[in-house]
Amino acid sequence: MKSQFSWLVLSSTLACFTSCSTVFAATAENIGPSDSFDGSTNTGTYTPKNTTTGIDYTLTGDITLQNLGDSAALTKGCFSDTTESLSFAGKGYSLSFLNIKSSAEGAALSVTTDKNLSLTGFSSLTFLAAPSSVITTPSGKGAVKCGGDLTFDNNGTILFKQDYCEENGGAISTKNLSLKNSTGSISFEGNKSSATGKKGGAICATGTVDITNNTAPTLFSNNIAEAAGGAINSTGNCTITGNTSLVFSENSVTATAGNGGALSGDADVTISGNQSVTFSGNQAVANGGAIYAKKLTLASGGGGGISFSNNIVQGTTAGNGGAISILAAGECSLSAEAGDITFNGNAIVATTPQTTKRNSIDIGSTAKITNLRAISGHSIFFYDPITANTAADSTDTLNLNKADAGNSTDYSGSIVFSGEKLSEDEAKVADNLTSTLKQPVTLTAGNLVLKRGVTLDTKGFTQTAGSSVIMDAGTTLKASTEEVTLTGLSIPVDSLGEGKKVVIAASAASKNVALSGPILLLDNQGNAYENHDLGKTQDFSFVQLSALGTATTTDVPAVPTVATPTHYGYQGTWGMTWVDDTASTPKTKTATLAWTNTGYLPNPERQGPLVPNSLWGSFSDIQAIQGVIERSALTLCSDRGFWAAGVANFLDKDKKGEKRKYRHKSGGYAIGGAAQTCSENLISFAFCQLFGSDKDFLVAKNHTDTYAGAFYIQHITECSGFIGCLLDKLPGSWSHKPLVLEGQLAYSHVSNDLKTKYTAYPEVKGSWGNNAFNMMLGASSHSYPEYLHCFDTYAPYIKLNLTYIRQDSFSEKGTEGRSFDDSNLFNLSLPIGVKFEKFSDCNDFSYDLTLSYVPDLIRNDPKCTTALVISGASWETYANNLARQALQVRAGSHYAFSPMFEVLGQFVFEVRGSSRIYNVDLGGKFQF
């Protein structure tokens, strides 16, 4: 009996569970293109899909619902459930809601109870003007409404644009939002929640917001809320992590007490592990131009870092937090983990009266900063100062660059406060330069950097050994309540001058300032010693310790430590003297730095080798002109006539030791004429113009214009005597053969225009002229051996080639200009070689090949004295000279179209130890 009763109870229970499962199980339904509807073309009536039992929709194709509610606004969402959950499986298809007029909560999708709504696997989801933000009748209530968990998972592109809600959440209103694993772009653009007191221009969540692991860019742009969160408002925790590119741009809140131009969070806001995050141009009226949060954690996760730029708080009275505002009793943590964090151009604007002050973060009453840290190689840049509420007073120490307990991450990067991005007028406002941290500060590791006139005001400051405090002259490190203790002070050399000094101060009664260890002089950019103030021996204001207690130094050497003892620029030695003033209030201890100049060592950008190297460019050009004249004198038909040719010349000189690579190239034309004298001597004359350029593969380029004239003469005599005997040693018969004697004179003038684009200084320009003279004397004789099959003749030859080129002195314009003394190149060479030539049977075509060895017998390599115009510091500049021996190959050809017209051309290749010269010319000759 007992057994039968138990079985009855069990059977009844199973039946009950089965019945309940049947009642509460969601219905599965396939939907597809047939469910699409366009109210502008369809004459029927659209009927929304409204249920109370929950449905799992599966798409079988793309669906578009558009232009709905034009005749009568919809009163329910296109898909809605008032009791249970809804789910949509996209299966790779798209779902679009376009231009929908509706008064329903969730014009597109709605689950009004505390149930859930999920959308997964779509190729694209589009919510455009659903309902429209530009139509106020009927008042819209958002595109998507969910009383429970709203999930977007594994979708492609997602677009919410120009949606409107008179309640919270212009596009989405939900309890909890999860937006994750999207492979396409996610965009929230132009959505509004602008009714009085409403929040979340794009998204409003009464619970949590999670935006994670989306692999394409995510954009929140031009969204507007009235009270809080121009783009996102979250009552619970807001987590944005593991995404690629995130941009919050031009979002805003409009109420007088409006907070969080882009994002407002009442609990924890965490933005971490993203490849790049940008907050730009967002605006609030009261607090937080970009972010307003109770507890904010920012951690860069990729090379793009996190950037806050041009966010503002603007109202009739000054608000708080140009970029970020931390609520009362809140916390803020910033970690540059895998990219920099930068604040630049953020501001507080008051319109009555009109004032603008730069500001990055404002710390609310009793709030605090828990972390400011950067890993090695990365930084947090505050180009806008941090401010703190007058009641933001914390006894908790802010440890700069300290890892969490149990975390071995090396936080040895830089925390930088700088005024370098301020305009000249902005730099005159003290508030734009002063950052306030109302808590004790300890530099645990890495660098604290103060640049360009900033002041860092702390409750007290201490430094751990191994860390570095880097302060420009003109900056101040201040403790308002406790003491300042520094163990490693570094000062950049390029900040010295104009009476500026580093100030380290303790302003509270009986509090002390202590400085120990050597002071390090830095040259971070590598050009600090290019400062022309160092061109003379002088003293600089250096360091001042100021305290109402005592100002002391311990183990500070009289000679600062130079971080770069070997450097370019002005050379010299440093010395330091201290003066105590214990009678003043506050007491001071002041150091003066003495510089003794001993010389100048130019950096590679200043050396200027392109100027003497230009002589080698002129050298190769005049040699090319010489070859063109010589070629034009050799003709198949009449010697008399006029000719013209195009000319191109290239010189490549490799880097050799400290002498950098050099390249010259030029091109132009040559025209001339030839005739025979009464004594049957051949004469030829020519005019040439070349346009060229030189480069030194660093910062300098030179443009050249060359004008040249040349005269060539050839005399033929008989090969006899000593020369005949000498030639008889060679194969072939030489006695009584013609001996060709030739000579050539050439002159060129080269106009040079040099531009030097320094890395760290303004561009300078200079112009000068090169004058080149060339003389050539040569002799050759032809033999006609029968054993040469490819050629008819061969002709040994010898030449004496003299070239002299002078570079004029000149000076560049500008404060960074240089002066160059004149220099010259003299070269005497003895080319020897043999020429092979072949003629056609009709004597209307020929080609030739010349092989030469060219030793330079006498050489004066170019160099010049170079000086800085502003200071007179000088040095010797040497050219990257060509080797003194060369091998040359010359190939040429002539073709006579008729007795009156002939085409001629040649190619020359010359190789030296570390250089190559190529030139080519092609032209024609009209003969008569």
Swiss-Prot record:
Domain Autotransporter span(s) in chain numbering: 635-928
Location of this chain's protein in the cell: Secreted, Cell wall; Cell outer membrane
Span of the signal peptide: 1-25
Annotated GO CC locations: cell outer membrane; extracellular region
Residue pairs linked by disulfide bridges in the UniProt entry: none
SMART domains: Autotransporter
Domain of life: Bacteria
Membrane topology: Peripheral membrane protein
Main location: secreted
Claim: Secreted is one of the keywords in the record: yes
Alphabetically ordered keywords of this record: Cell outer membrane, Cell wall, Membrane, Secreted, Signal, Transmembrane, Transmembrane beta strand
Protein family: Belongs to the PMP outer membrane protein family.
Name this protein carries in UniProt: Probable outer membrane protein pmp10
